[in-house]
């Protein structure tokens, strides 16, 4: 059976969209593992129902494997789970009102669960992180320079990095290349060459836009639950 990963992010309390994604995934052939790469909470709606569904999946749901994202990090900081840190980044960018709305959107009952989530996963030769290996808020886009992409991959020691912070869907490939380095020593300068294998960075999207990854074939499919196909089955070969 084909092994596939479904990667979602940016629901921000939207239980209806999560249910639509779960329903969509039931139509897809293969052995599917569901990863939720953060931003489950947000300031625009009450997030308790979605969080409860993630913690307590309904019969027939794919079990979600969750990590925390930027919005969870800001919430936990404001709630005292990050030492003396507060939600300064959110406060600076969105204002005090949004910080208060975020705090009010999540019942304190769920904070310990959010605080228990990991920063990211490393599966096979793939890194699954909300931002990047550098920072939870690191926003990788299609315009990020290749050297920065290579740095983020190298920090984790992976060949594939799945990221969600930008909310974009993209697949950037770093083809076989050679990195030259020059070392200055007492006995003279030396040049070293290091071959870099083919690597990739994938933006998984957000909200209704999600990504399906075929583990065996290394193929990426960008999907959404806004455009529903007429067929009841989605095979992807």
Regions from the PLM with identified roles:
Residues 1-6, 121-127, 196-200:
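Beta-strand-turn-beta hairpins that frame and shape the catalytic cleft
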Residues 1-53, 57-60:
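N-terminal active-site segment of His-dependent metallophosphoesterases
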Residues 8-9, 34-39, 65-70, 129, ...:
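Active-site neighborhood of phospho(di)ester-bond hydrolases with catalytic His/Asp-centered motifs
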Residues 12-17, 42-45, 71-76, 136, ...:
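Active-site environment of divalent metal-dependent phosphoester hydrolases
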Residues 28-29, 33, 103-175:
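His/acidic metal-ligating clusters that form di-metal
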Residues 43-44, 50-123, 147-151:
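Active-site neighborhood of divalent metal-dependent phosphoester bond hydrolases
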Residues 77-81, 140-141, 173-176, 234-235:
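Short aromatic-enriched loop/helix-cap "lid" or pocket-rim segments at secondary-structure transitions
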Residues 172-237:
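Acidic, His/Gly-rich catalytic cores of divalent-metal-dependent hydrolytic chemistry
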